[in-house]
């Protein structure tokens, strides 16, 4: 099936690499106009160039997801370029290990700002345009350890759990205004962020995956594509695990 996102305009945070870049390319393949919001201009423009070379339509907007003014500018730029906004994918995120004794308040606050508060800011900034579209979709990226926490990841577990509950609250708040809000819950993934996971932790996580391997960014992109499409018009407030069966065995 082609052009599953024809007529859609999608803003994807963290779109310069990893899960966000995979979504940007996949969305464009299916006809969406894509806005990549990121701080890494060089990598983001590389993704934009790939999309355009393949015949898609995309642009880069510098976006600091922790800053409300930056969000407002990004939404305005998307509307100016493409006439509106139908889809928001909150994919930007960070991770660093640290239990309750090791984690600093600075590290905690940074994790909360990027992984949690940024999603609040994004929803707040985008919702007027999403409502105006008449068929808006918000996709927030959580993590399996936001459902099943692990020791030694205090701030990451907390922020990714918050993403799930915040998504459900938003789903209820905007359901009668034509905006769906869903969460993707990735298991272990082959992404740049995985490089920050200690090898012993990564090995342990992989051993718990029934499929016996990490997922790839395209797996998340295909899930996000479905949730962004009209095929998911009756789906809101759900957690969609994409984890190789990991959550089944937890």
Curated annotation (Swiss-Prot):
EC class name: oxidoreductase
Superkingdom, taxonomy of origin: Bacteria
Active site, UniProt feature: 156
Binding site for NAD(+): 38, 64-65, 156, 160, 191, 194
Swiss-Prot/TrEMBL catalytic activity: 2,5-dichlorocyclohexa-2,5-dien-1,4-diol + NAD(+) = 2,5-dichlorohydroquinone + NADH + H(+)
A GO term for molecular function: 2,5-dichloro-2,5-cyclohexadiene-1,4-diol dehydrogenase activity
UniProt keyword annotations, A-Z: NAD, Oxidoreductase, Plasmid
Enzyme Commission number, as recorded: 1.1.1.-
Entries under Gene3D superfamilies matching the protein: NAD(P)-binding Rossmann-like Domain
SUPFAM superfamilies for the chain: NAD(P)-binding Rossmann-fold domains
InterPro entries in the record: NAD(P)-bd_dom_sf (IPR036291), Sc_DH/Rdtase_CS (IPR020904), SDR_fam (IPR002347)
Family: Belongs to the short-chain dehydrogenases/reductases (SDR) family.
Primary role: Catalyzes the degradation of 2,5-dichloro-2,5-cyclohexadiene-1,4-diol (2,5-DDOL) into 2,5-dichlorohydroquinone (2,5-DCHQ) in vitro. LinX appears not to be involved in gamma-hexachlorocyclohexane (gamma-HCH) degradation pathway, in contrast to LinC which has the same enzymatic activity.
NCBIfam families: PRK07231.1
Protein name: 2,5-dichloro-2,5-cyclohexadiene-1,4-diol dehydrogenase LinX
Species: Sphingobium indicum (strain DSM 16412 / CCM 7286 / MTCC 6364 / B90A)
């Amino acid at each position: 099936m082609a052009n599953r996102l024809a007529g859609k305009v999608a803003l994807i945070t963290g779109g310069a690499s990893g899960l966000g870049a995979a979504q940007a390319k996949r969305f464009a393949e299916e006809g969406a106009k894509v806005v990549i919001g990121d701080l890494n201009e060089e990598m983001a423009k590389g993704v934009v160039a790939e999309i355009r070379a393949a015949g898609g339509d995309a642009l880069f907007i510098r976006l600091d997801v922790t800053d409300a003014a930056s969000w407002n500018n990004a939404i305005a730029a998307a509307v100016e370029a493409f006439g509106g906004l139908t889809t928001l994918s909150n994919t930007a995120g960070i991770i660093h290990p640290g239990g309750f004794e090791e984690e600093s308040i600075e590290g905690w606050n940074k994790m909360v700002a990027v992984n949690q508060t940024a999603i609040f800011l994004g929803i707040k900034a985008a919702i007027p345009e999403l409502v105006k579209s008449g068929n808006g979709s918000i996709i927030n990226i959580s993590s399996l350890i936001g459902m099943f926490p692990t020791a030694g990841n205090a701030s990451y577990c907390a922020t990714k759990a918050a993403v799930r509950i915040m998504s459900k609250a938003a789903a209820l708040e905007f359901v009668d205004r034509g905006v769906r809000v869903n969460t993707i819950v990735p298991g272990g993934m082959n992404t740049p962020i995985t490089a920050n996971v200690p090898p012993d932790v990564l090995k342990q996580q992989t051993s718990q995956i029934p499929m016996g391997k990490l997922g790839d960014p395209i797996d998340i992109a295909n899930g996000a594509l479905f949730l962004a499409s009209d095929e998911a018009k009756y789906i809101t407030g759900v957690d969609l695990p994409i984890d190789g069966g990991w959550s089944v065995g937890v």
